[in-house]
Amino acid sequence: MERWAAPKVTAGSARRYVADQPSFSSTLLDAIYKSMDEQPGHGGGATGVEAVAAAAKKQHEAALHYGNYYKPSLAGSYRARAPGPHATTSSSSECSSYGGFSSSEAESSHHRRLRPIRTTVPGGAPGPAPEKKAKKPGASIRAKLRDLRKPASPGARLAGFLNSIFAGKRAPATPPSATAGAESACSTASSYSRSCLSKTPSTRGQAKRTVRFLDSDTESLASSTVVDRRRVPVEAVQQMLLQRMEMESDEDDDESSDASSDLFELENFAAIAPAGAAYRDELPVYETTRVALNRAIGHGYGHGRSARVV
């Protein structure tokens, strides 16, 4: 919306503005002159003057009422009806109809629209943050017990085992030993002797250690006795094993001799006959049904040996 241009104030308009809003004295004089013109031949001048004064007073009160009450309310209504931040000015016809509300006064009422005061709290405003509850020491213990009661899965057990292995490897660095500190402190021979004498650990409450000196013969004898003690159990074990093997072999021999279907008492005439070569052309006779022994017997029979197995 375009703003109307304010009319320029000239001398004639200034006089008209003064005439539109006359003072109380000028209004009173105008009323007196008017009454004198209307009643030139009557003798009631005092009554006419009082009536004129009352009319002038009434007009002045109306002007004061307009200036004190109606004018500010009109300006406020214009600001409220304005579409933009600035109020529009009124025309000259409106100024004349409202009893002298000129364009210059309308320019003075050109104010920025006031913002309404917010008296309610918006609903989207965040409320106060809730206070954090202090954790009780017993709560953590209960939580740990609850976790222990739960059945552990194989994967969790494996992970715990691996973590324990890696945690064991990451052992903290051991502090320097007392001997290293003593050696660093003993820089010279004199300080070394003094420090060693002063830093000897107390043997109170510890087991006593004895040192014995042995010659070479005694040492060799002691070592041989230790070796003999170590050898005795080995030899005893070997003897026990040999006896066990002999007993098992005897049991096997007894079982093989008792089996009548396994061995046969046959004689080999090829070994004792004078013409032993005559039996070599015949088929061999076996004394057992075992295939491995039969092969050995056949091989021996071909060479003229005895094929009897005892």
From Swiss-Prot:
> Which pairs are disulfide-linked?
none
| Known function | Involved in auxin transport. Positive regulator of the auxin signaling pathway involved in gravitropism, plant growth and grain development.
UniProt lists the family membership as follows:
Belongs to the BIG GRAIN 1 (BG1) plant protein family.
Say what happens when this gene is deleted: Decreased sensitivity to auxin and N-1-naphthylphthalamic acid, an auxin transport inhibitor. Reduced plant height and decreased panicle length, and grain size and weight. Altered auxin transport.
This protein's name: Protein BIG GRAIN 1
Tissues expressing the protein: Mostly expressed in the vascular tissues of leaves, culms and young panicles, especially in hulls.
Alphabetical UniProt keywords: Auxin signaling pathway, Cell membrane, Membrane, Transport
What is the applied biotechnology use of this protein, as the UniProt note states?
A: Good candidate to improve plant biomass and grain productivity in various species.
Which InterPro entries has this protein been placed in?
A: BG1-like (IPR039621)
Report the induction information: Rapidly induced by auxin (IAA) and analogs, indole-3-butyric acid (IBA) and naphthylacetic acid (NAA). Expression level is gradually decreased as the panicle matures.
Q: Where are the residues of the annotated region Disordered?
A: 77-140
GO biological-process terms attached to the record = auxin transport; auxin-activated signaling pathway; gravitropism; positive regulation of auxin mediated signaling pathway; regulation of seed growth; response to auxin
What ranges does the record list as Low complexity composition bias?
A: 90-106
Q: What is its main location?
A: membrane
Locations listed in the record: Cell membrane
Entry's Gene Ontology cellular component terms: plasma membrane
What does the further note read? Answer: The over-expressing mutants Bg1-D and BG1-OE exhibit increased grain size with both bigger length and width, and associated with longer epidermis cells of both palea and lemma in spikelet hull as well as increases of both number and area of the parenchyma cells in the hull. Some genes associated with cell cycle and cell expansion are up-regulated in the panicles. Enhanced growth of other tissues at both the vegetative and reproductive stages are also observed. Increased sensitivity to auxin (IAA) in terms of root elongation/inhibition, as well as altered IAA distribution and transport.
